Amino acid sequence: MTFFISFRYLLEFFLFKIIIFLLFPFSKKMSSKIISNSFMFLGKLSKYNQIAKNNCKMVFPNLNEKEITKIINNSWQNLGHNLFELTFLKKILKDKNKIEIKGLDVLEKIRKENLPVIFFSIHSSNWEVCVPFLDQNDFKTGAIYRHINNTFLNRYIYKQRTDALKTNDSFYTPKGKKSAKEILEGVINNKNIFLLVDQKDSAGTEVNFFGKKVKTQTGFLKIARKYNLKIVPMKNIRLPNNNLEITFEQPLLHNNNEVSDETKMLEINSIIEKWIKQSPDNWFWQHKRFN
């Protein structure tokens, strides 16, 4: 990394910290609103706004420009809420009124079976609460994450994530060869896996997603088959009052040798598509998913 890039990353990090400091006198509700609106304003000026619009038009070809713009504006606001909520992630998990849970019967059945499972979700609402929630409810979980380029922000985000964990049994591991090893060791030691499976994986398999063949991660399905792990959909949405709602849906199985990984991923993608169509404002449209 060159000196100038390092210096730029440092400036970005200090700017972020200064903004958070300046918001200190305001309530969390007001601060979150300021950050979310700022994200929307700045986001609309960035190149990612057009990427988001193109993605949205592909998924909703019948919507007009005004309707598409509204979805993308709300998506930018959701990202702003996420960024601010990351600064007090641990407190969010302690607030019993902030996160509403549905599908508790599914979760309790998994608890009683006491076998590792694969939880999956998408970049929707505040996805950062998922792993700490599982950990705080006694589900030892390993999660793979993609590090961001800014090393200072990356360190800060990692610390916020790990500080929100209740135990030392759960962990985060950066995507790569090391993560594959750590995740497998976790399964062997009766730990669960949590994955966000909606983003592009250049090394992945081409699977239909909203009618288009896209590179998709399917490696976790090989683990599910080998260790006979249930695959649990974990839907996550942001409610109108800015609270969060997590729904545990009925587990999927991948123990039929006649069903390929691609076919099973197609089933998972159909679940993801349903979630996105139900709550389009919540999804991370800015990612080059269909490129």
Regions found by a protein language model. Give the residues of each.
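Catalytic core of membrane glycerolipid acyltransferases/transacylases, capturing the structured
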Residues: 113-175, 202-206
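A conditional alpha-helix N-cap/helix-loop micro-motif detector
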Residues: 99-100, 124, 150, 173-177, ...
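Membrane-anchoring hydrophobic helices of lipid-metabolizing enzymes
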Residues: 2-121, 156
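Active-site metal-coordination segments of metallo-dependent hydrolases
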Residues: 51, 150-151, 214-217
